[in-house]
Structure formats: structure tokens, C-alpha cells
Regions:
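Conserved phosphate-binding elements of NTP-dependent enzyme cores
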Residues: 12, 23-26, 136
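Conserved acidic residues
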Residues: 9, 137, 150
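Short beta-strand segments that buttress and anchor functional surface loops
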Residues: 138-142
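Beta1/beta-strand and adjacent pyrophosphate-binding region of the FAD-binding site
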Residues: 4-18
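Conserved N-terminal/central alpha/beta ligand/cofactor-binding core
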Residues: 3, 7, 24-128, 132, ...
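Redox-cofactor binding/interface segments in oxidoreductases and associated redox assembly factors
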Residues: 13, 154-155
């Protein structure tokens, strides 16, 4: 990133797997793109099972790969174990699965987005969509900075007004030890979107 632009073609909010894929796809197609994330050290973090593949997820990874996405490549670079699942069943049920090193997976994705032309990164919390009548024109962050854009893609995952449950206890959060985000979720509710 050399210098932030006055107007972006695309702003992507959230740098999980979907956000990284969306930002790289837009940038690779020539759109000036800004990817905004809460934490640069947790780009594309594998929260639960650090695996790519299996019958369902494997199909999605292959489709993303066929469209030029990076998940399959990053998986190859971070795999610590590879296994063919369901070998006791017929060939139609066989499916490759790669267990990944979570930290390497995240670091490889960060390297990928940092070295993608037309893609800038910003660490902050988006709290509001900027509107001109019924058209989104950008975003405003918790730091009070406004970014203008022709398009905004929301890939917030579990963080919008997030609530975590451990046993009978519930508390705000996007993931363990990470805060939920507020503001944007309230605005989306005002416009009729289901949040939380």
C-alpha cells in the first residue's frame, strides 16, 4: 500500500476467508480495492477446524480455485497433514482433506493480500455505511475516518453484534478473546436486515 485513495471502486469489510477472496478477486480484475479488518494479525484466521476439504467444503474450495481464488493455494502452502476421507465407502464419497497450520494459513493469506496489486489494507472497525439517498457511497470507521467507494462488500462473519455462549453464560464477542462490533449492525437492522 503506497497511499490511500480518495475514492475506491470496492471496499471489503472483514478479512476472513470470504473477505480475502472478495478483495483479491476485485483487485485482480482491476478494481481499486480497500480491505478493512479489525486485526491485521488475524487475516483469514481458521477459527474452528483448521481443515480445508471434505465433501462439502472441498467442493467450495475447488469452485473458488477454478475461478482464480486463493484458498486452495494458501491451503497447499500451509498443509501439515493430507488425508483421503471416506475410503471405506464408494468412490463417490471419497474426498481429500488438508489439515492446515492455523498460523501459517493466516500468514500466507496476509502475504497474498499485501502483495496483490490494486489492494490496500486498513485496520479499523467499520461502524457505519455512508449513504446518498438509497445508495451506499462508502464507510465510516470507529477512528472517525470515512472512505468513499462505488461498491461495499460486507463479509463480517460472526462479529456483527456478536454473542458467544459458554455453558449457560452469554457475553459479547466475535470469537474467543475478540470483541463484537457494534454500530453497523444497528444500521443494518434499521434497513430491515436480520442481524445476530
Amino acid at each position: 500500500m503506497s497511499q490511500l485513495l480518495p475514492v475506491y471502486d470496492v471496499i471489503v469489510v472483514g478479512a476472513g476467508h470470504a473477505g480475502c477472496e472478495a478483495a483479491c478477486a476485485a483487485a485482480n480484475l482491476g478494481s481499486k480495492t480497500l480491505l478493512i479488518t479489525l486485526d491485521m494479525n488475524k487475516i483469514a484466521q481458521m477459527s474452528c477446524n483448521p481443515a480445508m476439504g471434505g465433501i462439502a467444503k472441498g467442493q467450495i474450495v475447488r469452485e473458488i480455485d477454478a475461478l482464480g481464488g486463493g484458498s486452495g493455494i494458501v491451503t497447499d502452502k500451509s498443509t501439515i497433514q493430507f488425508r483421503m476421507l471416506n475410503l471405506s465407502k464408494g468412490p463417490a464419497m471419497w474426498s481429500p482433506r488438508a489439515q492446515c497450520d492455523r498460523m501459517i494459513f493466516s500468514a500466507e493469506w496476509r502475504d497474498r493480500v499485501e502483495h496483490t496489486d490494486n489492494l490496500d489494507l486498513w485496520q479499523d472497525d467499520v461502524i457505519e455505511l455512508l449513504l446518498d439517498k438509497d445508495r451506499v457511497t462508502g464507510v465510516k470507521t470507529r477512528l472517525g475516518i470515512s472512505f468513499s467507494s462505488r461498491r461495499v462488500i460486507l463479509t463480517n462473519g460472526t462479529f456483527l453484534n456478536g454473542l458467544m455462549h459458554i455453558g449457560r453464560v452469554s457475553f459479547p464477542g466475535g470469537r474467543i478473546s475478540e470483541p463484537a462490533t457494534y454500530g453497523l449492525s444497528d444500521q443494518l437492522k434499521e434497513y430491515g436486515f436480520a442481524v445476530g
